[in-house]
Each structure stands twice: as C-alpha cells, then as structure tokens.
Amino acid sequence: ACNAAGLIDPVLRETPGDSAPKLDELETILDELCRLGGLKAVVFSQWTQMTELAEQRVRRLGLGSVRLHGGVPTSRRGELMDRFREDDAVQVFLSTDAGGVGLNLQNAAVLINLDIPWNPAVLDQRIARVHRLGQRQKVQAILLVAPASYEEHVLNLVQGKRHLFDNVVDPEATEDVVGVSK
C-alpha cells in the first residue's frame, strides 16, 4: 500500500491511481522536469501494476512514454529503447526490474524509483542504466519513499546492508562493523 492504496483496498480498486500520493508526487516531478524542463526520465518500479498507473499519470501530463515489463517480448525491447532514445516526443521510459539488465538509457537525465528493492545492488543497477559512460548530463536519482512506512524500514535495512558491505570490503574498516548485522 506504500505505492497506491487502491492496489489492495477493494473500496478503492476501481480507481487505484487516485489514492496514491506517490503518483501525485511523480506527476509533479515529471511536470517540472520533463514537461516544463524538457528532460527525459526513467521511472522504475518492481510492480507492473504500478508502472501502468504511472503511465496513466504520464499521459495525463501529455508526455509520450514507453513501458517495459517482463511481458514484453525480447524482440520488442530494442524498439522501445530506440523510441525513447530517438523520439523527442517520448520523454518517459517506465520499467520494471525486467529492464534492469542491459539497458543503455544515458539520454535520460532523471531516474525516479517508485519503490525500494531489498537488494542494494538492484538499486545501483537501476541508477547505472542512466548514469553510465556516454552520459553528458547531470543525473538526478530520486527515491520516492512513504514516510513512517514499512518501505522506509526497508530503505533503512538497505542502507545498513550497503554500510556493512562497504566496511567489510574496506581494508581500513574497524571490527565494530560486525555489530551492524541483526
């Protein structure tokens, strides 16, 4: 329910995107950075339904988009990436983590994460799709996290994992880092 209450609440199910503060925030960000600022953005979510709801908000702004998810045949994925890269009218690339590997999306300047993966490497991989060799723009990576939520707890766990990993592989790390693990 951190993403959109209508995804699980039967009362709100007919219009799940209407009860979604995250989508409201996404719409505000895309309006400012893409519609008014002319930038291209990549929006990641772990959930296909969430990318569908986000796509509705993108259309409402009058922005062009493409959407990649696990159900898109491999033969069509290159076409979607080409449209995003080459068509100035396509400003938003929506993707599940099915699009996390092998995507080269450095023509975007904005990366928006609608949810936080448990594995910090997945988050890094999402960012690497945009911030990579050939990138000529400053990249803005945005995490949309519901405050005081389970999701915020997951973010804290992910940050703890990252801290632990960084200190385990750092030759200068101290032994007290072991205490981070619970």
Regions found by a protein language model. Give the residues of each.
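SF2 helicase/translocase ATPase core recognition
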Residues: G64, R76, L80, Q91-G179
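Conserved Helicase C-terminal RecA-like lobe
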Residues: A1-F93, D97-V101, E172-K182
